[in-house]
Every structure is written in structure tokens, then in C-alpha cells.
Amino acid sequence: MFWVLVLLSFIVLIGDGMISEGAGLRPRYVDVGAIFSLGTLQGEVTNIAMKAAEEDVNSDPSFLGGSKLRITTYDAKRNGFLTIMGALQFMETDAVAIIGPQTSIMAHVLSHLANELSVPMLSFTALDPSLSALQFPFFVQTAPSDLFLMRAIAEMISYYGWSEVIALYNDDDNSRNGITALGDELEGRRCKISYKAVLPLDVVITSPREIINELVKIQGMESRVIIVNTFPKTGKKIFEEAQKLGMMEKGYVWIATTWLTSLLDSVNPLPAKTAESLRGVLTLRIHTPNSKKKKDFVARWNKLSNGTVGLNVYGLYAYDTVWIIARAVKRLLDSRANISFSSDPKLTSMKGGGSLNLGALSIFDQGSQFLDYIVNTNMTGVTGQIQFLPDRSMIQPSYDIINVVDDGFRQIGYWSNHSGLSIIPPESLYKKLSNRSSSNQHLNNVTWPGGTSETPRGWVFPNNGRRLRIGVPDRASFKEFVSRLDGSNKVQGYAIDVFEAAVKLISYPVPHEFVLFGDGLKNPNFNEFVNNVTIGVFDAVVGDIAIVTKRTRIVDFTQPYIESGLVVVAPVTKLNDTPWAFLRPFTPPMWAVTAAFFLIVGSVIWILEHRINDEFRGPPRKQIVTILWFSFSTMFFSHRENTVSTLGRAVLLIWLFVVLIITSSYTASLTSILTVQQLNSPIRGVDTLISSSGRVGFQVGSYAENYMIDELNIARSRLVPLGSPKEYAAALQNGTVAAIVDERPYVDLFLSEFCGFAIRGQEFTRSGWGFAFPRDSPLAIDMSTAILGLSETGQLQKIHDKWLSRSNCSNLNGSVSDEDSEQLKLRSFWGLFLVCGISCFIALFIYFFKIVRDFFRHGKYDEEATVPSPESSRSKSLQTFLAYFDEKEDESKRRMKRKRNDDLSLKPSRPI
């Protein structure tokens, strides 16, 4: 019996050894390190969440096949050195992964260690956009990178129409690189960071006065949109000091990054002082869908935290990060790979290390395989779908946009990389096509600082007491637009009145002073004038400034306050106005022939209708009136007499067509004569100007000179500079130039005084005049809105009429004779008259042939009554024919029929 017991004991020992050796493939514990500052808000929340995840993973022994996940948290105590020591400690204890570090500064340092020892490092708080997978392949961000956070903020700024922002941030990698990313995103939207206020890392402890100093600087600046990218403790202090300085009032815009939402979620309620200082602030939170998993975890939180701290989004990502590691461990163990570590030859070969035990740092042999399992994770966690893109960024990054209000905070919308700004949850939009158009971007109403719901302008004039220097051209001609008052530096004119009226419509004061540019002896060069805005000589320039492409590249223009464009002016003559102007369209022969045909056609119709139409019968006087009335009423197609004969209708139809052509031509010609001036120059527009060899005048200082040389390829030798309207007129009259090219407003003013000239052809450029401001100047936008307001209310037109609506033109440089005018001549219509005449002749021929035939057939009965002499016989026949012609056809037929019957009754009857 004793030996049996010994044998059984030996078998058990052997079995235990075999089991232990086999179980080596699945270790009892898989170690994971975590490095956080547990005294911080993030550290406290993430530590609780990681422990909960560890318990959930280990609650199912089958998940890791009997192995357990063991997470050891190292408290870095906000100290960089301790953070490094914690990482080294985990590398010595064979940790397969490290969760952390908490800050991007340490992530940059420790990522080199992770790369060397092949230990994956996962962080959901170190979200620096510069931590790339190419540089640090073993560093994985398990929450959306701050690159997307800055993209969301940039789209918000663009959505509200702000062009400049101020960045206030701590001098650390995460904050600094985040602001750099923001600057890049803003630049693509024509916005910019106008000032960067950098605060030391420990500013609250070591130099709190530095916060006040920076806020005072910001207070005196132009921009009122401030981005705060810092830590919760620093951020709280910033807003408290800003409130004391009156910077949480109407007009300011404050946007805080995700640090504020973590504070709002975890500390509830906030201290009254802090809550009051945050009213009206916008902030963002990483979006996590409201899934059942999330709701269940939120419900557990109070029990997990014992009510000491609220759950924020970093707690959710901490929980999911543990599960990412656990699933990767499961896949590694399921692949039957041993979890093993080996010495790093680079470290073991180091000599003179003193007491440093660098040889204890070992390489994770399966690190690359384990990393591959991590980045290929595809799971649904409490934060939603977890999946990495090829560049290691999280799939479908999105944010909640939060507005801090009196009773806490409220959500005003979302941002997602898929669809931009929306009031619909991003997960509802992922199945739709991406639409990033401005019309598809929406957010709900915001309560801004100061309690206002009106979107702040985002900028004010700098509070430095300096007035804006507004450049004004000191013109030598066309002073209706801009001119210096005699004996002073004051200015007046159309452009000045428009500017002053627009300034009055702006809802804030615009202190300014006008500064003259030029000597007043000749017009200044406007390209140089505009360039002075770029180099800072002027804060803006006002005047008759054409908006052209070259200038828009260096300055921003307002909405045009007057339309403009280049036109060609050439000499003309004009017909003298007379009471008989209505006779000008036709030459005298044309009038005579037209009048004759009215009478001829009327007579022909009377002849054709006289015997059969009662309306063309009656006493001679009535018939003459009928002929005249019918003839001339056809001019207006208002004749009331009906034609019943076929021939009459045919003639009338042809005549009405002729009348239609004549009246239409008359109307068009009269309109042209009364409204269009007549040329005595071969220049008919820009095309003939280019092809001609004549000299061309232009206004000194105008862009027309460069345009003709560069765009129209007109030789510089053909161009003649002119300085005033009088020089224009003299040059055109004496033939110095064949034409002048200038902008339309100048030309209109010139023609109102000198009427012997006219615009030839159409405007061959389209532009306008505006006021120029520095690039991205918010004042340019407000001035444009004000100019539109002036236009809509009619005030802009009143200013125009005050300065430009005048006409002193009384002397004419010539007149146009009948031969030179565009009168309608007979040769243009002889074909119509010929057709009408032939039709009348044919109709009369047919008619007389028919009536003569009928007369000789029936009229002989009248002649048989007497046998006169030959002379009297011819006279009697003519009288009989005329009587027959004048007799109504029906009566003639009845008379002839009656006479025939009488003749038959007088013949003797034949005997029976």
C-alpha cells in the first residue's frame, strides 16, 4: 500500500509538471502598465474606468483561456521624470503594453523607448497631431487626434464668418502643435490666427500674473474670438480673470477645447465662481453614440466612483482602450504564440552603466505581432465603433458642440469629418453621401457671452486711440468724385459721401481721418495708391478705385458702389432738333411715292368695289371722302369699309403688307434718329480701335493704359495721356487722337459737358469701383453690407444724383445732312411699290376686261333705241358705258333682264 501511494504521488507530481509546462503558453497573468497622474481629473477618472474594464475582462475566465489581465497603474504625480521612471519600470516587469502617458510631451519621449523595446503604447489623452505612426509606429492614439478637433473649430469659425482669432495656450507639445494644426486649417478657409498668447506650463502656480498680462494684451487687440487650448486648472483661472477684466461681456467669443467638457462632465456642480465665468463659452466633446453599452456603463459609474467624480469622455475611452488590449491579447494567445521577452543587445553591451540596470529592459518578442492585432481592432465599445484607418487615425471622428449657459450646458450641434457641422447626430449621416456645402452646415442658436443671442462680429477696432488713416487721391480732374477743398486738407466728392454714409450704417464707431495722396497737379497712379494699403501706409483707401484682378491679389475690396468698365469714345455729330423731326425717317421722294400709293390704292379699291359694294357708292363728294379715308386708314389697319370683290381683297392684302413694312421701318428709323447720335469717325468700337492705326487717348493714372498694352496689344507709341475733360475734347476735335478709352463713370461725366462725342460699341470690360482694405479685414465685409443697405434704401442713388446727374451740354460740334443721315430712301422700297403697282394694274386690267365684256354683251340694248349720227353715236356709247360703270351691278343686271323680256314680248307669235 505504501508503494502504491508513493507511485500515485509521483504521477501527480509529473502531471502537475506537465500541466505547468503546457500552461506556459497561456500565462496566468498578462501584465499591462498604465501611467497617469492620479491627482488630476483625467487621472482619477481613467483609473476608475480602467479598473472596471479589467474586472469585466477577467470576469469571464474563458475570454483569455484561463489567463488574466493585470493592469498596474503608476502615479506620475504630474512629473516628467517620474513618468519616464514608470515606463522603465514596466519595461523591466515584462508588460505587453502601456496605457499612457497622459501628456504629449511624455508621449514624444517614451515613444522612442516603446519603438526600441517593441512594447505598444496606447493613449487616449496624448492626442498631439504631430504624433504620427510613421515616426512612432508603436504609439497608438485610441481617441480621435486633435487634428480633427482643430478642424472642427476651424469650420465653426468659418461658419460664423470670423476671419481672425487669438490662440491662448500652454507651452507644451499638445497645446502648441494643436494650435499649429488650427492655423493650417484656418488658412485653408481664408482665416488666420492674429496673435498667439503662450502661457508657461505651471503658470497658475508660478506666475499667475502672466495670465492677466496676456488677457490685457488681448483686450487691446482687434480680434474678439479667443481659442483656449490648455489644461482644466489653467483654463479655469483664465476665465475667472477674463471675467474680472470684463472680457466675458457682449462682443467676445470664447471657444475652449475638450478640456472644458471633461471639467463640466466630471465636476457637477461647478463652483459658482467658475460657472459664472464660463457663461456663453463654446466647447467641444468627443462624440460617443448613445448605445446600450454606453448607457449601462454610465449607470454603473456612481457605484464605481463612489460618487466622488463624474464620468467624462476620457473615462469611456479608458474603458475601451483596456478592451482593445484584451482583444489583442486574446488573438495573440489564440495564435498559440508564447508571450516572451528577450534582452536588448544594444543595452546589454553598454559598459560603465554604474548602478543603472539597463540590461533588465527587455524586448517584447511578439511586440510587432501584438501591435498588428491592436491596429486591426474592429469592435463596438462604449464609445461606439472602434476601428483604425491605414494612417492609424480613428474611424469617423466627430464632436459634440456645447454651449455653456446659466443652468449648465446644452448641445447646439455636432461636427463630423464626414458631413461637417450638423444638428443631426453623425451616426445618422454616415449612410448618406458627404455634403460639405455651406448651405448644408447648421448649428442651433447660441447664447454668447453677455447673454446675447446675436452672433458677435468677432472683432473691434484696437483700443489704442489711433484713428484709421484713410487714403484719398488728390485728383487734378473729374473732381466730382474726389477733390480737396480749397485751402484745407478736407475732402469732398461722390466717393467721400458714399463712404461717410456707409460708415454711419455700421453699428460701431469707426474713427478715421482722410489723408491725401498725390500733389493735385496730376492724377496719381492708382496702382501705387492701392499698394500703400499693403505696406501699411494707409489702413484703407477711398475714391474712384477700379476693382481689377491685379489689385484684388493684394487688398480686399468692398461691394462696388458704382458700376464701371472701359468704353471707347469717338467724335460724333447730332441732328438738330426741329418741330419737323418726325419727317426725317423718309426722304422727300419716299414721302411723295408713299402718299401717291395711298391715293392710288384707294382709287383702285374704289374702282373694284364701286359697282358691287354699297359702302363705296353715293354722291361724288361722299365717294371722294371714302377714297381718301379708306386710303389713309389702312396706315393704321383701321379701315371700316369691307371689300367684297376678290380682286379688291387681293389688292388690299398686298397693300396692307406694304404698309406694315413701311410703318415698321418708319418707327425704327425715327427711334434711331431721335436717340442715336451719328458718327463722323471710323471708330465703331474696340475691334475697329485695335485694327486701326489711329492714336488712342487715356486718362493719366488709370489702369486703362496697362490694359490696352497688355490685353489689347495696342502699341505704347499709339497711346496719348490726357489729364482732364477739356483735354479729351480738344484732342478729339483737333484729331490728336482718334478715340479715347476710359472708365464709364468718367466718360458719362465727360459727355454730360461735351456732347459732340459718343460711346462707340459696348463696354468691353465689366467691373466697378470700391473701397480697398487690407486682406482679410473684417471692416471690408461690414462696409460691403452697408453699401448694399445704401443701395436698397435709395440713398446711394441720391448721392449719385447730387454729384453726377448734370448736363451742361448746349454746343454741338456739327450737324448731319440728309445725305449723311440714315434716312430711308425710295431705293430701299421700290421693290415693294413695284409689286403693289403691278398687282393694282393686273386687278384693273382684269376688272375692265370683264366690265367691257359685260357692257358689249348687255349694253347694246340701250344703243338700239335710237340711230344717231356717227359722232353722236361715239359720244352716246361713252356716256352709256360710263352710266353702265356707275350703275350698281345688280340693278344693271335687272334692267337688262327686264329689257330682254320686253323685247321678247313684242315679237309676233308664230302661227299654230
From Swiss-Prot:
Determine if Ion transport is one of this entry's keywords.
yes
Which CDD domains does the UniProt record give? Answer: GluR_Plant (cd13686), PBP1_GABAb_receptor_plant (cd19990)
Subcellular locations according to the entry: Cell membrane
Q: How does it sit in the membrane?
A: Multi-pass membrane protein
Q: Where mainly located? A: membrane
Cytoplasm recorded as keyword: no
Show the segment(s) annotated as Disordered.
Answer: 888-912
Per the record, what ranges lie on the membrane's Extracellular side? 23-587, 671-828
Q: Which residues lie on this side of the membrane: Cytoplasmic?
A: 609-617, 639-649, 850-912
What residues are glycosylation sites in this protein? N306, N338, N378, N417, N435, N445, N532, N734, N808, N813
**Disulphide bridges, residue numbers:** C755-C809
Q: Which GO terms describe its molecular function?
A: calcium channel activity; glutamate receptor activity; ligand-gated monoatomic ion channel activity
Top-level lineage group: Eukaryota
Q: Which UniProt keywords apply?
A: Cell membrane, Disulfide bond, Glycoprotein, Ion channel, Ion transport, Ligand-gated ion channel, Membrane, Receptor, Signal, Transmembrane, Transmembrane helix, Transport
The record's function comment reads: Glutamate-gated receptor that probably acts as a non-selective cation channel. May be involved in light-signal transduction and calcium homeostasis via the regulation of calcium influx into cells. Could play a role in calcium unloading from the xylem vessels. Acts as a negative regulator of lateral root initiation and development. May restrict primordia numbers and position along the root axis by a signaling process originating in the phloem.
Q: What is this protein called?
A: Glutamate receptor 3.2
Q: From which organism does this entry originate?
A: Arabidopsis thaliana
**Phylogenetic classification of the source organism:** Eukaryota, Viridiplantae, Streptophyta, Embryophyta, Tracheophyta
What's the encoding gene here?
GLR3.2
